[in-house]
């Protein structure tokens, strides 16, 4: 049976603003099944952002599990991510999921994989999914050669990825944590 797949998730931090954005396309084989899926969420009373790349059905399970870890470790993003990665690697059901998560709060930005990896990206930006390399390249150039806000940077880079990657569209969902606001 073919998997639902194809997405692009990009996270960036600039001037105290943290943004995670994702496109809305869900693909089954060679067919676009949905164009407005939300692959980015707010967790832990809006203080943590999370984006998902992988099979759509797996997203709810992973978001729920990660939220449980955030509650257990009182919002400590790094500790919750490490424990989530351990569970993901060792749990028989979770181990079968092929996915990646980007999670971020005001202090940290991490990628969590089913292999048990927790990666702290360089340069305050990271992208995952089929269009991830395109979004990462565009975001890196924009970060180095523009004064765009984190939100504008994510919007522009995801737009570029949507122009290049057939599994990515321009129907974006974006969540952000501002530098001073009570998001």
From Swiss-Prot:
PROSITE patterns per UniProt: PROTEASOME_BETA_2
Pfam families with a match to the protein in the record: Proteasome
UniProt-annotated location(s): Cytoplasm
Entry keywords, A to Z: Allosteric enzyme, Cytoplasm, Hydrolase, Metal-binding, Protease, Sodium, Threonine protease
Record comment: activity regulation: Allosterically activated by HslU binding.
Gene Ontology cellular component annotations, sorted alphabetically: HslUV protease complex; proteasome core complex
Entry keyword Cytoplasm: yes
GO molecular function: metal ion binding; threonine-type endopeptidase activity
Primary subcellular site in the record, as a coarse category: cytoplasm
Catalytic activity, EC: 3.4.25.2
Enzyme type, top EC level: hydrolase
Residues binding Na(+): 162, 165, 168
GO annotation terms (biological process): proteolysis involved in protein catabolic process
Enzymatic reactions: ATP-dependent cleavage of peptide bonds with broad specificity
Active site: 7
KW Coiled coil (keyword) present: no
InterPro entries per record: ATP-dep_Prtase_HsIV_su, Ntn_hydrolases_N, Proteasome_sua/b, Proteasome_suB-type
Function statement: Protease subunit of a proteasome-like degradation complex believed to be a general protein degrading machinery.
Family: Belongs to the peptidase T1B family. HslV subfamily.
Subunit (UniProt): A double ring-shaped homohexamer of HslV is capped on each side by a ring-shaped HslU homohexamer. The assembly of the HslU/HslV complex is dependent on binding of ATP.
Protein name (database record): ATP-dependent protease subunit HslV
Organism: Alkalilimnicola ehrlichii (strain ATCC BAA-1101 / DSM 17681 / MLHE-1)
Lineage: Bacteria, Pseudomonadati, Pseudomonadota, Gammaproteobacteria, Chromatiales
Gene name as annotated: hslV
């Amino acid at each position: 049976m073919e998997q639902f797949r194809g997405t692009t998730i990009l996270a960036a931090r600039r001037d105290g603003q943290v943004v995670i954005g994702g496109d809305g396309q869900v693909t089954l084989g060679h067919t676009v099944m949905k164009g407005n899926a939300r692959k980015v969420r707010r967790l832990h009373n809006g203080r943590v952002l999370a984006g998902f790349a992988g099979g759509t059905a797996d997203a709810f399970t992973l978001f729920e599990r990660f939220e449980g870890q955030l509650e257990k470790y009182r919002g400590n993003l790094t500790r919750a991510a490490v424990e989530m990665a351990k569970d993901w690697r060792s749990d028989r059901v979770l181990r079968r999921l092929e996915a990646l998560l980007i999670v971020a709060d005001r202090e940290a930005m991490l990628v969590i994989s089913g292999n048990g990896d927790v990666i702290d990206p360089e340069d305050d930006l990271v992208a995952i999914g089929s269009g991830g390399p395109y979004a990462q390249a565009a975001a890196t150039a924009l970060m180095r050669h523009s004064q765009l806000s984190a939100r504008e940077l994510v919007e522009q880079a995801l737009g570029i990825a949507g122009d290049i990657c057939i599994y990515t569209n321009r129907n974006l969902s974006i969540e952000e944590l501002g530098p001073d606001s009570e998001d």
